[in-house]
Amino acid sequence: MPRPIRTLAAAAAALLLATACNSASTGGTSEKPGSSDSSVRGVTADAIKVGGIVSMTTASGYSKKDTDLGARARYDRANAEGGINGRRIDYLGAEDDGQDPARNLAAARKLVQQDKVFAVSPMSSVTFAGADFLDGQKVPTVGWGTLPSFCGPRHIYGFNGCLVPTPGGTLNQTWPEGLAAVLGGARGKSVALIAGDNDAGKFGIRTFTQGFKAAGFQVSYAKAVVPATSMPSDWSAYTKEILRSGPGGGAPDAVVSVMQTPYNIGLFTALKRSGYKGLLSDPTDYDPGLLAKDATKQALDGVHVLLQFQPFEADSPAMRQFKADIRKAAGGKDVPLNMHMMTGYMSADLFLSIAEKAGKDLTVESFQKAADGFSDTGTLVGDRAEPKGQKESFGCGALVRLTNGRYEVAVPFRCYPPIPFG
C-alpha cells in the first residue's frame, strides 16, 4: 500500500534518536537494465535484493526486532501480488546492530559490499553510523526518520519524513498540539522535558522546547541529563528536580520523556511513587507486549503515547490490510501489534511505492528520479511527498492512552501545520 538517530526517536517520533551508515559500489548501466546480467547492484531480471538494519538486541533489553517482521509482511504481499514491475523482492532480513555505532556501520558495509543489496529498508536504530557510507554508495535507504541522517542526504528517506529538522526547516507539532488538546489548552500549562545525555537527546530537548513553547506551554524543565549508556537504579535526583520545576516551585502539568521504554518505566514509576498526578507522555510505549508484566502495566498506566501513524484501534481499509499482512507473515497467528512492526511495514511500503514508480528499468538514478516527484495520500502515516520528506515530517499523528491495561485513542490521527525551526 503506497503512501517517513533514537534517543531522539524519543525526540522527534517522538522520538528515539539514532544514527546509521552505508556502503558498497554501484555499477554502471552498460547492460540493459532489465536483463538478467544487469550491472545494477542488487537488481536482476526477476528480483530486487533488499536488506535491513535493526536494533534486534540491546544492552538494556530493549528490542526493535518486530521491525523486521513488519518489513517482511509488506514485502511478502508485494511478491504475492506479482512483485514490482515484474520483479520479486528478495528480502534478506535485518542485520542486528545491537544499537552500537560500529556494528551499524559494519552492517551497512556487509549489506552493500558482501550481500550486494540494491536498497536498505528498514533502518531502525538509535544510531546511524552507516548513513554517510550508504549515501555515498548511492544506496536507497528507508527507515524511521528520528535521526539527523534522515534529513538531507540524497538517498536516505524517513518513512514518515524528516523528524529531526535543520535550521531553516520545520518542526512537527503533533506532540505539543496533541497534549494541549488533552489538557484543555496549553495556556497556563507547564511541561517538563527530559532526555538521555547524548547528542540525540540534547537535540531532542532543543526541538521540543521550541515546539512546546510555540504551542503555548511554559517549559519549566528541559534537560538531557539521564545517562544514555546505563539506566539509573535511583531516579530520585531527576524526579526531585522535575517536581519542583513548575510554577511556584510545584509540579509541572505534564512530564514528557524522550527516552526508550526501560527508561520510561523507571522514570514514570519513580514519579508516581513521589505522588505525581499530572500527565505523563512518551513516544515509544505503544506495545501490547509491554502489558504482560504487572509492574510494567502499572508504570505505564495513564501514559499518553505519541504515534506518527494511525492507531491500531483505527478501522480504516489501510489498517485492516496491515493487520492481515502481519498475521500472514506471523504464520497465521494473531500476534500483538506494536510500533516497530509499523516502522518496518511503512519503510518497506515507501520503498516499494517509489520503486514501482521508477518503472521496469530500475537503477539508482531511475529510483531517485521517481522519488523526486513522488506523492500519495491516505496512507497509514498520512499524505506522503518527496523530496519534501527529506526536509520535514509529513506532520501527522495521534495520541493513545493506556487505561486499565488497554490502549485507547486520546487524540485521533490528524495532520498539523508545521512551524519554522531555528
Model-identified regions with their sequence ranges:
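Extracellular/periplasmic Venus flytrap/periplasmic-binding protein
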Residues: 102, 157-274
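Beta-alpha junction/loop-to-helix N-cap segments that form part of ligand/metal-binding clefts
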Residues: 36, 62-69, 81-153, 226-235, ...
